[in-house]
Amino acid sequence: MSSLFYATTPTVNAQSDLQTIKYRNLVIDLGNGIKTNARLNLPAIGDGPFPAVLLVHGSGPNDMNETGGYVRIDNETGSIIYPPARPFFDIAEYLSERGFAVLQYDKRGIGANFTILDSNVWGNATFDDLTQDAERALDVLVQQPEVDSNNVTLVGHSEGTTIVSRVAINNPGIVDNIVMMGAFAQNLREIGDFQGVSLPILYAQQVLDHNHNGLISVQEASENPVFSSLVGNLTLVLAQNITTVNGTAEQLNPQYNINNDTFISIIDELKHKLIDQLKSLSVVTQGEKCSGLKEPCPIWLTSHFSSIPNLDIISKVPSDISILILQGKNDSQTPIQQAFLLQQKLTEVRHPDHTLITYPDLGHSFYPSSQWLTGIGPIQEYVLQDLFGWLSDPVRGFTKVTILSSSSQMR
């Protein structure tokens, strides 16, 4: 595997007067004329070689920081205001300050602030493309003079957890550890069913069905911000027939449904509409461009549906590659059961060194969250401490199976 890259001179990270990090901007050649920007984060002092970490994104049009929100300029002070969530920036900064070389890269077709630079490249990206991109990034990482190529870790978040396991299998002589944060065990089809059907139905049953009769008010559901975040525009989801309070059938008029007393059946109507909506996402319309900002790109989605589940892939990771799984118990995108399934599979195949750490109040971004929605903010420091501690553990490499529940109160 050979990847071309273009480098600039290392630059000190100008965030304070006393610098602890320097970095080098790179351009990675992904093949077929496609290039992407990357950044190598290094300790400010020393030439290495440093243990290396590659960060592999979750789904969607992610830049190298996995930015959740937009960078903007304060009109009064002129200072840069960063968005509340930049999980890969948090990881890169924390680890490089503590002696690691960390490589981040933008997804193909994507630039800073998850800007789509090339809609054709991004809209036609497949799961295999993204896996190959991670392989190219790994190739570039181990070529850097400051990197210890005998100590390489892959950190995947969400969709990235399905990629790092594959890259590890393909590069057994290079990869030493993999870390899975907010992990996939099942195929994205099952993950999508949880996000788009099971979770909204559970919310409707537990929160909106006040009379416990299996019916919810269209008006209340439409005005509920959590439910709207889960299902989108309820009027569009429902489409046609609905059931009123007295049991008669009415035609839902999208223009007026917010102001009437219409009720719908959670199981007989809402669930079927949510299933139909989920199926429609994977329909590929010839010539239609996809941004992936609101809905997933159909080409990417269908490529995922045909992929082998991570639960089957993980069992093939070589026994000398250590595995860490970090999981928030309030993850509303990849529920904690996914992490338990991976841990059970690793135990079944007798993988000698795997660890699962769960966090009671954290969501998919490892920030405090409810069980329904992902809170947006910086990764909690105790998660970063756990990650660094595991990577720095001198006794790893011996037979070690660990399941921990961690919280800020334990610190």
Question: What are these language model-derived features?
Answer:
Residues I45-P49, V53-Y94:
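Short, surface-exposed "cap/lid" segments of acyl-processing enzymes
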Residues W122-Q144:
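Alpha/beta-hydrolase active-site loop
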